[in-house]
Regions:
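Short, small-residue-biased leader/transition segments that mark boundaries at the very start
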Residues: 1-2
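Short Gly/Ser/Thr- and Asp/Glu-enriched loop/turn motifs at secondary-structure junctions
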Residues: 6, 43-47
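Short, well-ordered beta-strand elements within core beta-sheets of diverse protein domains
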Residues: 8-16
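Short amphipathic alpha-helices within nucleic acid-binding modules
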Residues: 17-26
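Short amphipathic alpha-helical/adjacent loop interface patches that line ligand
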Residues: 25-28, 68
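Short arginine-rich
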Residues: 27-39
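C-terminal structural segments of small proteins and small subunits
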Residues: 49-74
């Protein structure tokens, strides 16, 4: 069964090309591993979309906002 919380943080990021998008996603992955909290990410040529939620509580937690702030810092 697939589940998606009604409560989530989501942001679209734009870049000049695919490699910049890929580098951003790789950096998000590193931050996520450090935090132990992992977003859903989709990306392609010139864009990345990051969606953050806490599945265990079916909503938002403090960790979501911390991760979002750290991702914003590298964008």
């Amino acid at each position: 069964m697939l589940f998606r919380s009604v409560y989530f943080l989501e942001k679209n990021f734009t870049f000049k090309n695919f490699l910049q998008s890929q580098d951003f996603v790789n950096n998000v992955g590193k931050i996520s591993e450090e935090e132990g909290h992992h977003p859903d990410i989709s990306f392609g040529w010139g864009y990345a979309k990051v969606t953050i939620t806490t599945h265990a509580i079916e909503g938002l937690s403090e960790n979501d906002f911390i991760l979002a702030a750290k991702i914003d810092k590298i964008s």
